[in-house]
């Protein structure tokens, strides 16, 4: 500061003693002699310390604050229930009354962690923890007491180097192109507890896997191989949930009894201009357990597993705003009469045959504009030689061509702060229909609110007969930080 004051005084004195020079500088430019030079060694007396810290932040982040930057935490309170008072016609069994009732009332914490802790290394994990409040079906099943539960969604470490990428830990592997309705999307098991989850994308469960991805030098083709080190199966429905049907006995988990179960598969994918194709093969276990009735001295059913081989092909093609999808699956040695309605378990049937199955799914995605999108997916499957091995009078639960269809529409409004979505889903035999509409509103960077309406209709004999004329409403308030 002293040096600056001295410099200011010198300039003031110069202006008083040499006014003519100042006026000349204003009237015409001063032209220096071309022989004039400056000595770079001259010390003008500037104090460099005055600039230290001028552009630095006032305070550095603590190690704890930097560590928390890798976390994303979402806290949500959700409530939903069946709102329509009605009765279900069960034919010769009479009618079953259904009253409006609150089904879910819960506080959920979602925690996600992702850290690129070194070049080529990534650690990622996510989990949720729930508190079930009064009138939630988990609360009722717990003897009218608050219940808590936590679950690890995924936790893996990834190493990428050159053309190779390795991932080890709990993760999901998704095959197929048809969105939400692919016959190839059967690697990971899933859990449909209630009607708060109706999309397979939200129902998938992670498993302990090693995944190796190899990319060619042009990035036009890749080879992906997985090994499932501990195959798991669809959990039995939670007692008391809307999707629980009491069979009169317990549905336990499969007892491995020292058995080593492993799944493995590989997929080759090739990209062309505007399209992709893929070939895949895998050795898998059916995700849905099959239960035989319990023995006379035990209340527990006897779960059984079945392994099979899968061969698949998938392709897509982009034409303007339209993306066409196609999947083909051939399954060898699957259980022919396995009952696998989402959220329920396979109950024993008098027919216990293993057959080959051919399935296909196809559809399209259409981008109406930058905010609107619509997609259609149709899945159809059939058993090959379905009558072979059947005794006179026997028939399969799934005979002929069976499958489902799915239509989705989404629209982002108000610069993406307001999102509307609609889903229609039914079976190919036109026995049931589910209609879902959702509205999500982002209040600010932290707060958001969402609402859902689910309407269902089903004919007699459908797996969804018990939910005919159900109308479910739900709302969720979320805080993210």
Predicted regions and their residues:
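Repeated loop/turn-to-beta-strand initiation elements of outer-membrane beta-barrel proteins
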Residues: 71, 119-123, 163-166, 219-223, ...
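Outer-membrane beta-barrel "beta-signal"
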Residues: 453-455, 468-481
